């Protein structure tokens, strides 16, 4: 799978673009705050209909514009696709081969993308919300059902929280309605948690392989799901998960009324990374943390390939300078030239010429993008 053409207008600070990409490696060179990250965000949004930087879609519409439009041509083994997504103040609309999709869950998955940014280095020791967002962004693009239940859960959770606030303020008193909302939240939550366990089982295998390949060590990396309802296990089916959630909701009913918010569920769950059984949050060095984060991204590539039969595109946002040459080599050798890769950098010297021999290079300045005529080694393309 690769993206051959990309067009956009009205997205953040980017000038209107119509770019052709190399099927292998594309490098975007420019100083900070010139639009490199915005460009990768736009490509990522075209793929999964969400930003990795904000949950407010309106932020991505350029000042003075009514909407932002993103479009691309995707080549797969069996077919070519034209994708388009429009962000307006009313919401999002998406098209595949000029046919508007009834739901975004029908659109997501036609172009798979893995993005690796400096913020991902915080996956191990950062806030739990980073790890939950990691799961939702990555698992959502490989399974429409996950995306559907995640969206449904967010809506139901908001409704339940709003009603808990009304009860706390004595603006409502109907406990039957609270019971209905609790049942609905538990149903959506159980489906979401069950799918997280399933995908993490596969992700674990690939992440362990990637960690050993990058580090050259025999340490075993494991990724564990830590549900906020501790009674839930990986062996549970959705019906069992739902019942355990309902039992816990009954136990904490008074506390939730006092706090006026839902105290357990997927929005409170977390991931734990272990090296040889030790919690990496507590014991991992900075180098080990970076290797764990990188291993996760590489395992996502393998997982998507397993489930779809296609390599996703890989977006590396200013991370090459964060990696030493050995980790750079491990990263690019791991994808072995079959994954279309987009790299942003402020300095071409941060990218080893031995690793990336003939990329297509673009300059970015004040949102304007032009192609450089020479490769990394100075030869004309």
Swiss-Prot record:
InterPro entries: DNA-binding_RecF, DNA-binding_RecF_CS, P-loop_NTPase, RecF/RecN/SMC_N, RecF_2. ATP binds at residues 30-37. One of its GO terms (cellular component) is cytoplasm. It comes from the Bacteria. Its main location: cytoplasm. Pfam families: SMC_N (PF02463). GO terms for molecular function: ATP binding; single-stranded DNA binding. The keyword Methyltransferase does not apply. It is found in: Cytoplasm. Disulfide bonds: none annotated. Keywords: ATP-binding, Cytoplasm, DNA damage, DNA repair, DNA replication, DNA-binding, Nucleotide-binding, SOS response. CDD domains: ABC_RecF. GO terms for biological process: DNA replication; DNA synthesis involved in DNA repair; double-strand break repair; SOS response. Belongs to the RecF family. The RecF protein is involved in DNA metabolism; it is required for DNA replication and normal SOS inducibility. RecF binds preferentially to single-stranded, linear DNA. It also seems to bind ATP. HAMAP family: RecF. This is DNA replication and repair protein RecF. It comes from Lactobacillus delbrueckii subsp. bulgaricus (strain ATCC BAA-365 / Lb-18).
